[in-house]
Amino acid sequence: MSNFSLSPSPTSGFSLNLQNPTKTSYLSFSSSINTIFAPLSSNTTKSFSGLTHKAALPRNLSLTCRHSDYFEPQQQQQQQQQQPQGASTPKVFVGYSIYKGKAALTVEPRSPEFSPLDSGAFKLSREGMVMLQFAPAAGVRQYDWSRKQVFSLSVTEIGSIISLGAKDSCEFFHDPNKGRSDEGRVRKVLKVEPLPDGSGHFFNLSVQNKLINLDENIYIPVTKAEFAVLVSAFNFVMPYLLGWHTAVNSFKPEDASRSNNANPRSGAELEWNR
């Protein structure tokens, strides 16, 4: 809040005194102009702020002004610009876990990777995936995560699980060392098959590692409800694993207009107009 004092002046009729001149303000009259100047009477006409009034008898008038709300958003914007540019949203880890008597299963998404281009844009360099972590039981409601085995599902493998019916099954084979000198020394096979009683599916991960002489099978049943949660989560996260959310968020009307003007008869444009 800032205070103005209005006092008579022999030459101009009134003088305006600003007690706090450092802030930009506008006048906000609590009463109308007619109420303020109605008691004033004189034969001499003076002009003040575009308003016509007659010279008044000697008296002091007090006017109160407040700062415009327009300046508050500007101050907030300046404060935001002063924040460190390196500051970003902290990374969040999420997952869905299933605990059974002989094993536990944790499902976690992994984000895709992007590489920068010379134009300043980014291109998808690696699709995201879903990490399955199997841990054998070490006791009642206890699991040995130091012996966990992992299996990464690609987007295509996720699609296979999503499309499974109540009596359908699928199988995936992974060799982490494929293309290397020790190819074939580690073998991972994940089987997803329906339970005999039709109550859900079981996930069976078989790991053979000749490098450390390991041969292990981890089996965990998944109920219909738990499987439905997995399918729902897979459907939701699929566009993010493909990186499509970044492209959709970057769509701008001016980009489409500029592209059409640069190549008005492109193949995509002709196909869309059919």
Swiss-Prot record:
Chain intervals for the UniProt region annotation (Disordered): 253-274
A Gene Ontology cellular-component term: chloroplast
Subcellular location: Nucleus; Plastid, Chloroplast
Stretch forming the transit peptide: 1-54
Keywords: Activator, Chloroplast, DNA-binding, Nucleus, Plant defense, Plastid, Transcription, Transcription regulation, Transit peptide
InterPro entries, A to Z: ssDNA-bd_transcriptional_reg (IPR009044), Whirly (IPR013742)
GO molecular function: DNA-binding transcription factor activity; sequence-specific DNA binding; single-stranded DNA binding
Lineage: superkingdom: Eukaryota
The keyword Transcription is annotated on this UniProt entry: yes
One of the GO BP terms on file: defense response to fungus
Tagged with keyword Transcription regulation: yes
Residue numbers spanned by region Required for ssDNA binding: 100-105
Motif (Nuclear localization signal): 178-191
Residues spanning the membrane: none
Function: Single-stranded DNA-binding protein that acts as a transcriptional activator of the pathogenesis-related gene PR-10a. Upon elicitation, binds a 30bp promoter sequence known as elicitor element response (ERE) and is required for PR-10a expression.
Assembly information from the UniProt record: Homotetramer.
Family: Belongs to the Whirly family.
The protein, known as: Single-stranded DNA-binding protein WHY1, chloroplastic
Organism annotation: Solanum tuberosum (Potato)
Gene from which this protein is expressed: WHY1
